[in-house]
Amino acid sequence: MKIFLDTANLDEIRRGVEWGVVDGVTTNPTLISKEGKPFEETIKEICNIVQGPISAEVISLNFEGMIDEARNLAKIDENIVIKIPMTPNGIKAVKVLSKEGIKTNVTLIFSPNQALLAAKAGATYVSPFVGRVDDLANDGLKIVEEIMQIYENYGFETEVIVASVRHPMHVLEAALIGADIATVPFSVLEKMFKHPMTDIGIERFLKDWEKYKTGR
């Protein structure tokens, strides 16, 4: 399974890339706004750090605006993926962009039916929001499982990005059902490294080594 970072923070992205476990990045207007830099400047800087898919979201909600923004964003770097909201205009835009060879990521997916429509339009990726679905007292990972089954049934090549990840268990469950990608906040990536027994083991090794060196 591929792991993307869901952030626009350059320091977090650099650290994840240095660890060797980050395959791509997803951003959205909220994440970009937190960094206090111009939109395109931030996207370009991310492209310089990550050699993999980088999702940049359109702001327009009308069809023509989405197409114009998408074409301009796609010129920034060959790794740019255009993030499009799951709306009728969005799906219409995905159909046009896919024919032009522009990669797309349909976001704000909350049902298998939405994912089916996105795949039929030619989306490169879909992003089901598992955390937000969980908030509604539903099983977010069940929706991912159903989406993947539909894609397998009909041979869709659209990849599933598990989004709105809240904790490492979401990543584990996504991996167990065979999701293509999980996009995670940096805080979740950090937690994936940790286990109390690992810390205890390291502490014991260090104590034993110190005793060995001092002959005690």
UniProtKB/Swiss-Prot annotation:
Record GO biological process: carbohydrate metabolic process; pentose-phosphate shunt
This protein's pathway: Carbohydrate degradation; pentose phosphate pathway; D-glyceraldehyde 3-phosphate and beta-D-fructose 6-phosphate from D-ribose 5-phosphate and D-xylulose 5-phosphate (non-oxidative stage): step 2/3
Magnesium keyword on record: no
Alphabetical keyword list: Cytoplasm, Pentose shunt, Schiff base, Transferase
Molecular function via GO: aldehyde-lyase activity; transaldolase activity
GO cellular component terms attached to this protein's record: cytoplasm
Catalytic activity: D-sedoheptulose 7-phosphate + D-glyceraldehyde 3-phosphate = D-erythrose 4-phosphate + beta-D-fructose 6-phosphate
Cited InterPro entries: Aldolase_TIM (IPR013785), TAL/FSA (IPR001585), Transaldolase_3B (IPR022999), Transaldolase_3B/F6P_aldolase (IPR004731), Transaldolase_AS (IPR018225), TSA/FSA_arc/bac (IPR033919)
One Pfam entry name: TAL_FSA
Function: Transaldolase is important for the balance of metabolites in the pentose-phosphate pathway.
Family indicated by similarity: Belongs to the transaldolase family. Type 3B subfamily.
Name of the featured protein: Probable transaldolase
UniProt source species: Thermosipho africanus (strain TCF52B)
